[in-house]
């Protein structure tokens, strides 16, 4: 039997149109390490996509859905052990531990390289290594960047075709010496000769590793979502945030939307919310009854890359080309535009299958179907669910859909120059304390709001606060460097723009989730959030009033347009009030965060907290 070192090198099959010698040498190195049976260079064509989908249907990874119900759409169901991002197996391997900071998992880069070298040795044996070139952002945009992912998963290839600008055109932009982020991914399940594959190969040992200084990503053991689609959180946030730190721009966990007034004035807003706070719903918001003439358009629902433009303003692109959204809870009531987007050309993962070859998930309809095949391939009925509590779809079940199919897509969504941002919005899920909406008085106060935002991880009992998980800027799992340095980067960027005379975006903090004495949400949310958005835009134009609070500026009841909605002043008081004892407790919690981050914390943040305390004492 041949020793591994004696294995005949695999043919690289480099296409004539690939001219980048550094890229070719890297592919050769990784192929020598991982030892795939063959190497395929992906061109991003429809024919390639269809062929790989059919290959996965034959292999049991995917199921073709009823074309009369969901044209050209598929359902994939993962291994039950491989269903979500694995934060505890996600590492930032900066040269110095302090550059990763206390909120990231750090490992020494040299030791990690040795560990991964052992795991990746022969990891693709029996499989195909796909070379997946992709652009994050419109091809050739000054805000865009290129990556190349080497993966042994055809599921990754087809998802990357939807989620990024993937294929041959990327090599034209890359040329012979262009910069790219190298991404290496393996499901970690090599096949011996004659060994039968499984429907969803993965490995109990998982690593998602980032090397900030060399801009590399290595992922082992998972075929799912952000662990395997390395353009998404790994590149577009963790690596890109470090690039932004070094180059003077921002990579943010933010939606981007356009808002056009009845008079034709257009605004652009970027908003950051942690998971389960309605980011995709807000990105695709439909103005409610009574707000005729207003229009909301979608540029992105998850990630924004933001760079200072020649005009001194901050310009943003959505670096993605698709939506990788959470399915459960999505319905025509909660997100009509998303449901319209999902009618064709979609890959669903870990949702349930109906008897007529369509998909279903919790929250899609008021009444579930009488019978389903659940995400684990088992029979499911409402009676079984009532008896066992078993969900038909996994709570983190996903859809992958082309952005161009979104009915509310903004005509500027692929503008290579990006769109100029007028306002930033930050929000969490809090049943008490945090008002419906607050405007920061200045950039520093806005950074403070974003740095201290959080969401309750447990349902709050009546009169009690839930356990609050701080999620600064909604970036806690995604910031690729020290969180204190990240705050400082925001502060410095604001100062630098102010010094040039630029108009900075206003910063707002929102909370749709305040509860009343009955434990129910007071604010109706969804489309009605447009009323809050309209107040913000009125503030930008100097047309809307506001009331000074200890913590920023909030609207009075009369400052909100209530046309078409019955919402009493008493209810409004429940969602806008500032409870001083609760805020004293809140500031103590802010202190806990600042203590954790004390080593490099910018002094502007404790000074802002002190100013809030002074106003409370006045």
From Swiss-Prot:
Active site: 277
Cofactor(s) needed: Mn(2+)
First-tier enzyme category under EC: lyase
Positions contributing to substrate binding: 85, 224-226, 275, 396-398
SUPFAM superfamilies: PEP carboxykinase N-terminal domain (SSF68923), PEP carboxykinase-like (SSF53795)
GO function terms (MF aspect): GTP binding; manganese ion binding; phosphoenolpyruvate carboxykinase (GTP) activity
Keywords carried by this UniProt record: Cytoplasm, Decarboxylase, Gluconeogenesis, GTP-binding, Lyase, Manganese, Metal-binding, Nucleotide-binding
Pathway in which this enzyme or protein is active: Carbohydrate biosynthesis; gluconeogenesis
Family to which this protein belongs: Belongs to the phosphoenolpyruvate carboxykinase [GTP] family.
Protein name according to UniProt: Phosphoenolpyruvate carboxykinase [GTP]
